[in-house]
Amino acid sequence: MSLEERVMELESRMAFQDDTIQALNDVLVKQRRELDHLQLQMAAMLKRQEEMGSQFETFEEDAPPPHY
């Protein structure tokens, strides 16, 4: 294999690696956006659960004992 062929082979491999790296980066960016969105949803659900939990606690305090 001549030097020119070796250089062409290396350039070809580098181009494929660049494409792979870009594809992986695109997936990583998409996953990061999805993770950020899921974290916001989780925070909203936790807040809602806390609000609903305090509503149920007041109902339980006002309820008569089970033997009535």
From Swiss-Prot:
Domain of life: Bacteria
Name this protein carries in UniProt: Protein SlyX homolog
Recorded name of the encoding gene: slyX
Stored HAMAP family: SlyX
Family statement drawn from the similarity comment of this UniProt entry: Belongs to the SlyX family.
Originating organism: Pseudomonas syringae pv. syringae (strain B728a)
